[in-house]
């Protein structure tokens, strides 16, 4: 069963509201509402993501994996749709608060 976050990311991909990869996120000019990174992201890329978090004034979350994405080599992505980003933030903060995975 897919998690809610996986579903929301899937909706954002279908809508075309996702930026893939640290370099693309760093060069992106429009507003980004939430940043997501995997645990396997390199330390240098984590620094880039932190700079982007400050630049875009948004939240940055670490997620277990992105195996559900077709782009298997993707370890960082940004959501550019406010409503989907808000839904992801709500679910992720609830998970972090409760210390459990929400399906």
Regions from the language model: what does each represent?
Residues 4-34:
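N-terminal first-folded block
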